[in-house]
UniProtKB/Swiss-Prot annotation:
Location of the protein in the cell: Nucleus
An example Gene Ontology biological process: regulation of transcription by RNA polymerase II
Protein known as: Zinc finger protein 82 homolog
Predominant localisation class: nucleus
Family (UniProt): Belongs to the krueppel C2H2-type zinc-finger protein family.
Job description of the protein: May be involved in transcriptional regulation.
Originating organism: Homo sapiens (Human)
A Gene Ontology cellular-component term: nucleus
Length: 532
């Protein structure tokens, strides 16, 4: 059987600096994994070579193309000599140049690494009759001719089609997820073991991969190499810049087939799809609670351990994640870099601006499938949906009263402790919530910023305007499931439901008579001459 050597570059991928910058983070990590795995395979097959510079750089999280340029300056003659030379000592044997880095394929071709089968290879450190090049710079591997033919046949198809040829032989025993490259499995397995071998010397934060540590260290150094030519905003890594640039062109190429929502990044779509599937792959080993995103699990674990890594040097407030600290720090600096072009209002966070702009555009992309009502924010739809389901996940441990919103629970709990920390400087009235104080202060200044376009009536609160507008539209979104009677207000529905249930939660302490509505109790107390 004739043996044919296959070049290392035949199953490797290479990019120019410009091409490298257009790879996203996931693709760069995959590239790094494939190259390290290929090198590991060659070593295990008996290729006695010193570690190439590019492999050392990849292990350290460095950019590979920098090493490529350096290597070509050092050995230009060797590379020219051995790049295309065909040896005729045996039938069709070619020299393998492990540091050649010839640009052959795009990232979609990474799956060809799976064609390397250990049993099919024989290694040789020297071709008979050839003077051995510089130590560690070249090596060759022989492969049966039929395997080379198989390789050549597969390279004749499109890059996308090649992905379907490649299996995923490396399977995680914990969750069953499979990978094309062993190194990917190694990285993935650290999610289950919690192993984070790469530690930041500045803050002690640890990471599973060196590339992640490298990006993190730029937070400390303030290094932002990638600047947007449109708006001048700078980023730590190129992937963040490319995602940002899609905002300017409005590109959202990744669309959810379930609901049609589109995303700029494939990873965002993957996370979003778990809402539809209900998948929560990340489980807390302490309490068993599951999460859709690993970042959510990490934050949850920090809450349990009271481990708060990010502390504000101005006020000492601590945060679970660095992004929270960065947003908070803008409070001290007064920085609000994101300005609305319609009204000039500025925001500390880009997402706040995006949500605000929907006020001007009228965009409400989130629709309730039960009643057809639409919302500008996904969270508002979630809260609204609880009206239909009756879900009240937040329970007071003092009186066991349940609430559909966490903010309602917090507000309610202050009743038990009697705390009203927010005082009005005008009249001295105290409130449990800052939002209540803000609403109250508009009474003193006479501000009513929310005006009805139908009749011109103005309101202090947007919520009041929304309720008022239902008078003009005739909308009654809150329906009783018992008798199908509909109401404009949720509070009216709650009161109505007590007719069916017989519930009378408001009791007179004087005579023990009970009432369905608080206003009825107030009116009744006048009989006893009780001051309210």
């Amino acid at each position: 059987m004739a043996l044919r050597s296959v070049m290392f570059s035949d199953v490797s991928i290479d990019f120019s600096p410009e091409e490298w910058e257009y790879l996203d983070l996931e693709q760069k990590d995959l590239y790094r994994d494939v190259m390290l795995e290929n090198y590991s395979n060659l070593v295990s097959l008996g290729c006695f070579i010193s570690k190439p510079d590019v492999i050392s750089s990849l292990e350290q999280g460095k950019e590979p193309w920098k090493v490529v340029r350096k290597g070509r300056r050092q050995y230009p003659d060797l590379e020219t000599k051995y790049e295309t030379k065909k040896l005729s000592l045996e039938n069709d044997i070619y020299e393998i140049n492990l540091s050649q880095w010839k640009i052959m394929e795009r990232i979609e071709n990474h799956g060809l690494k799976g064609l390397i089968l250990k049993n099919d290879w024989e290694s040789t450190g020297k071709i008979e009759g050839q003077e051995r090049p510089q130590e560690g710079y070249f090596s060759s591997v022989k492969m049966p001719s039929e395997k080379v033919s198989s390789y050549q046949k597969r390279t004749s198809v499109t890059p996308h089609q090649r992905l379907h040829f490649v299996d995923k032989p490396y399977e995680c025993k914990e969750c069953g997820k499979a990978f094309r490259v062993r190194q990917q499995l190694t990285f993935h397995h650290r999610i289950h073991t919690g192993e984070k071998p790469y530690e930041c010397k500045e803050c002690g934060m640890a990471f599973r991969q060196t590339a992640h540590l490298t990006r993190h260290q730029r937070l400390h150094s303030g290094e932002k190499l990638y600047e947007c030519k449109e708006c001048g905003e700078a980023f730590i890594c190129g992937a963040d810049l490319r995602v940002h640039q899609k905002m300017h062109i409005g590109e959202k190429p990744y669309e959810c087939k379930e609901c049609g929502k589109a995303f700029r990044v494939r990873g965002q779509l993957t996370l979003h799809q778990r809402i539809h599937t209900g998948e929560k792959p990340y489980v807390c080993k302490e309490c068993g609670k599951a999460f859709r995103q690993y970042a959510h699990l990490t934050r949850h674990q920090k809450l349990n351990s009271a481990d708060r890594l990010y502390e504000c040097k101005e006020c000492g407030k601590a945060f679970l994640c660095g992004s929270g600290l960065r947003v908070h720090h803008k409070l001290h600096t007064g920085e609000k870099p994101y300005e609305c072009k319609e009204c000039g209002k500025a925001f500390r966070v880009r997402q706040q601006l995006t949500l605000h702009q929907r006020i001007h555009t009228g965009e409400k992309p989130y629709e309730c499938k039960e009643c057809g009502k639409t919302f500008s924010r996904g969270y508002h739809l979630i809260l609204h949906h609880r009206i239909h389901t009756g879900e009240k996940p937040y329970e007071c441990k003092e009186c066991w009263k349940a609430f559909s919103r966490y903010s309602q629970l917090i507000s309610h709990q202050s009743i038990h402790i009697g705390v009203k920390p927010y005082d009005c400087k005008e009249c001295g009235k105290a409130f449990r919530l800052l939002s209540q104080l803000t609403q109250h202060q508009s009474i003193h200044i006479g501000e009513k910023p929310y005006k009805c376009k139908e009749c011109g009536k103005a309101f202090r609160l947007r919520q009041k305007l929304t309720l008022h507008q239902s008078i003009h539209t005739g909308e009654k979104p809150f329906e009783c499931k018992e008798c199908r009677k509909a109401f404009r207000l949720n509070s009216s529905l709650i009161q109505h439901l007590r007719i069916h249930s017989g519930e009378k939660p408001y009791e007179c302490k004087e005579c023990k008579k009970a009432f369905r509505q608080h206003s009825h109790l107030t009116h009744h107390l006048k009989i006893h001459n009780v001051k309210i």
